[in-house]
């Protein structure tokens, strides 16, 4: 996870390649708490983070917003009492790019 979390996102254009099945297997192994979901034919990374209350969940959400702005890559975020569901995918390519794994690792680091 640390290796990915230290990487920088690269600009992802509409013609950027999605991760291959081999890359997916290698990258997902580095972020074992994340799952792969498919919604509307679009592969996405998703993880639920647990908190003791809503205030802590909201604080994490706000820190994640700052992280996303700094890296110019933005997740889906659902903040509820005691949990935050984070979903990463690359909108421009309608699927997964290495950036999504980088940001998932950075999100894990933020949570620690």
Swiss-Prot record:
GO terms for molecular function: 4-alpha-hydroxytetrahydrobiopterin dehydratase activity. This is Putative pterin-4-alpha-carbinolamine dehydratase. SUPFAM superfamilies: PCD-like. Its EC number is 4.2.1.96. InterPro entries: PCD_sf (IPR036428), Pterin-4-alpha-carb_dehyd (IPR050376), Pterin_deHydtase (IPR001533). It catalyses: (4aS,6R)-4a-hydroxy-L-erythro-5,6,7,8-tetrahydrobiopterin = (6R)-L-erythro-6,7-dihydrobiopterin + H2O. Belongs to the pterin-4-alpha-carbinolamine dehydratase family. One of its GO terms (biological process) is tetrahydrobiopterin biosynthetic process. Keywords: Lyase. HAMAP family: Pterin_4_alpha.
């Amino acid at each position: 996870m640390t290796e990915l979390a230290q990487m920088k996102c690269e600009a992802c254009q509409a013609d950027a390649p999605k991760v291959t099945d081999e890359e997916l297997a290698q990258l997902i192994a580095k972020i074992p708490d994340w799952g792969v979901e498919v919604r509307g034919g679009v592969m996405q990374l998703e993880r639920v983070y647990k908190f003791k209350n809503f205030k802590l969940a909201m604080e994490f959400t706000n820190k994640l917003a700052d992280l996303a702005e700094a890296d110019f890559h933005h997740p889906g975020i659902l903040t509820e009492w005691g949990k935050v569901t984070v979903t990463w995918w690359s909108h421009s390519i309608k699927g997964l790019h290495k950036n999504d794994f980088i940001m998932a690792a950075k999100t894990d680091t933020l949570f620690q």
